[in-house]
Amino acid sequence: MNITSEELLKEARALEPQLQQWRRTLHRHPEVGFDLPHTKELVKKATLPLGEEYQKLLDRAFAERWVDVYENDGKQSGAFSCGVFGVHPYVLMNYAGTLNDAFTLAHELGHSMHSWFSDTTQDYVNHDYRIMVAEVASTVNEVLLTKYLLKTETDEKRRAYILNHFLESFRTTLYRQTLFAEFERKAHDLYAAGQPLTATSLNKVYHDLEATYYDGIGIDADIDPEWSYVPHFYRAFYVYQYATGFSSAVAIAEHILTTGDASGYLKFLTTGGSDYPLEELKIAGVDLTKPDTVRSALRVFDETIDELAKILL
């Protein structure tokens, strides 16, 4: 049975009882382990379209132990890449052998390669790339890994899990961060109109946005205060850059895989902070002054839903 994303949404809206928000991330999937040597090979194979120099740098990162891989007592949780001008980037991870860990390694190495190319091309004043483009290189690697896994995986259940992982990336990065940005704007609008910013008023703003963005499912009141634990709101309008960065990365990866040409993207990686972010992205083939990039990403989102529906329905 073939079903489109529009038909799937229509069915979700018609469900009795209504699909609830808290069930959104529940799924059945096979337990697949990803040991570190296998993950390293996956990341290398997925990024082959980026060329020989990129591959050699990945080899260096692994051989010279740029990555602090495993969990340890007293170690900070999560993962991040730290660029160090004049040396090489360092990556902190807490690798536990899951699919998500494989994507995290690809993601953080994307940051590291961006730092390396910028640091070795630009002077100290211009080496540091800006927040606007910070998540592009990391997400390009995630998209390339997704596409490689889908190309090589034959088990339908595993393919479904990979597709769902990709869709969740869209939801949490493109849609959810845009929701956050709209919430932030509405909070400023309330203040400008002389309205008091109380927990009650901000909860209502957030609830209404959740109901708008996720109109196909039931919204629980427990989600209303979610805004209060988002630290990014202390940096004005930080969050929308996740959505623009993700959209840009999807467009760049699609271009590389379709044309085989990564030259513009590789040049973009060298620019650091030497130009305005919008101008740097144009070098990689992305023009965020036009809607095409976001529309292209949303088209990939629709196509991914259609592909998942063919497996599940």
Where would I find each of the regions flagged by the language model?
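C-terminal, non-catalytic "cap/extension" segments appended to globular domains
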Residues: 61-70, 105, 113, 143, ...
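Short pre-active-site segment immediately N-terminal to the catalytic Zn-binding motif
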Residues: 84-106
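Post-HExxH zinc-binding segment in Zn-dependent metallohydrolases
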Residues: 118, 129-158, 166-168, 172, ...
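Divalent metal-coordination and catalytic microenvironments
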Residues: 26, 107, 138, 183, ...
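Catalytic Zn2+-binding segment of zinc metalloproteases
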Residues: 110-124, 144
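N-terminal capping segment at the start of a domain
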Residues: 3-34
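Short beta-alpha connecting loops at secondary-structure transitions
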Residues: 90-94, 122-131, 162-169, 188-190, ...
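Contiguous, non-catalytic segments that form substrate-binding/exosite surfaces or channel walls
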Residues: 31, 35, 43-90
